[in-house]
């Protein structure tokens, strides 16, 4: 079936149809282009989503990523990132294999179609020209025939008329002959033009037009075939990434199967186990001992003389597992809230926290830790209680078990660093030997300098390892000793559970390094420093860096503050660090923070510089 023979008279319809075919192809190209944009945007959004939920370095999330469930989630995010990459592949292949190629093909198609229809119109113009020539020749032949017939009739009429002269008859006869000759010439010309037209028309409808229409048919079939191939390519582009997407999904499934509930539970134990033993039973407190006390027995409560005598002092049994971890530390650091503004007048009633405002019964800071300071033991973590303090190098601020793990981790890291330095030293040693044998390859002296530097680094790292291994051995020894001690104390509690409060005020070590005692009613117990070797260390008090004069009275009710009276002279041991508080000392053990705006500070420059 050929368009040239079947559609020889459908030139205009074929022109419209081929134009429609090109428009369909352009519509498909536009569809693929928009699909590629969607895939690209989708891949970008997936990557951003995966990046958004990735574990941030140097954050709490990085510490939590050790759990199997978190690892599985991170694996899922990584697989989704690869999954997004496959959608990018779809977008890129659709653009390069379909959009670009079909756009070029459409341009070629338009050019070819234009050329074919130009040839068709040219053939039509040619046949139309021949037709016009035929019509003109036919009309001329018809006109000449009529003119010859009229001339013949005129001659016959003149010849039959006896009144007409012979000359007029001859003239009419000649005129008729001329007209007959012209008619014969027109007839010959018309016959020639007609033959030519028939020949042109035959070539037009049986040669030119079929050839042009066949080319149009081939062009259209090529367009249709190319679109079919493109649709197949469209499917193949997606099919090619299906195995990789399947692997991504398999990775997610595998990570989900790797989640271990028991392992995560064990990690929680390893992360938060303190190494302390649970507290023993609380002993009975015999308050009838107050009736047997003498006047000298109550001398221990002299430190509470500043408290309101109407408010009875209550004994507090504080069990360390139920105390906030930073409770003790907050007592020795500056208050978290901003200091109160200075009063408008020096009247005590105008001072915040003055005597006219409701007050909460509070023991002075030095009295709170009276028993702690008896033998002058101080906690290791006191070193870091200054504002802006950092974690101690020996991790003494951590519970024993966590401290042991941190120290072990530090030792392992240092050993890895040492191994790296040793490997680098071995490589440089070989390089130096090569340079020594072949000086043209490099300078052996420069390598020797690097070897000296690496040797120094190794020595420093080994010193660090010995230091941390010493702390680690110390912690491990204390943990084993504490376990033995706890077993002995468990038997002691069973035999002494009926003792009075004077015999049952046993110190307990808390996870944050603090100890809890009941010292409100028993005589002062002298504690030797060896009992607190696990978490305390002797440290000299802060030196005095100046003096200050209180210009307003301040009744320190918050933890870590100290009360002062107007005009009182005190010692400054720590400057204002920008938070509005200054640390001062009244006596050896009575110190705390007051608002900087409530005092006039006179710093000793020599002490400050030293």
From Swiss-Prot:
Q: Which Pfam families would you find in this protein's record?
A: FCH, SH3_1
Q: Name one GO cellular component term.
A: cytoskeleton
Coiled coil ranges:
67-259, 392-484
Q: Where is the SH3 domain?
A: 543-604
For region Disordered, the annotated ranges are 295-319, 331-364, 383-418, 478-544
Q: Output compositional bias ranges, type Basic and acidic residues.
A: 409-418, 478-487, 506-525
Q: Where in the cell is it found?
A: Cytoplasm; Cytoplasm, Cytoskeleton; Cytoplasm, Cell cortex; Lysosome
Question: Which InterPro entries does this UniProt record tie to the protein?
Answer: AH/BAR_dom_sf (IPR027267), F_BAR (IPR031160), FCH_dom (IPR001060), FNBP1_F-BAR (IPR037449), HR1_rho-bd (IPR011072), SH3-like_dom_sf (IPR036028), SH3_domain (IPR001452)
Top-level division of the source organism's lineage: Eukaryota
Name all F-BAR domain ranges.
1-264
KW Cell inner membrane (keyword) present: no
* Entry text on domains: The F-BAR domain binds the phospholipid membrane with its concave surface. The end-to-end polymerization of dimers of these domains provides a curved surface that fits best membranes with around 600 A diameter, and may drive tubulation.
Q: How does it assemble?
A: Homodimerizes, the dimers can polymerize end-to-end to form filamentous structures.
Q: Which family does it belong to?
A: Belongs to the FNBP1 family.
Q: What is this protein called?
A: Formin-binding protein 1 homolog
Organism whose genome encodes this protein:
Xenopus laevis (African clawed frog)
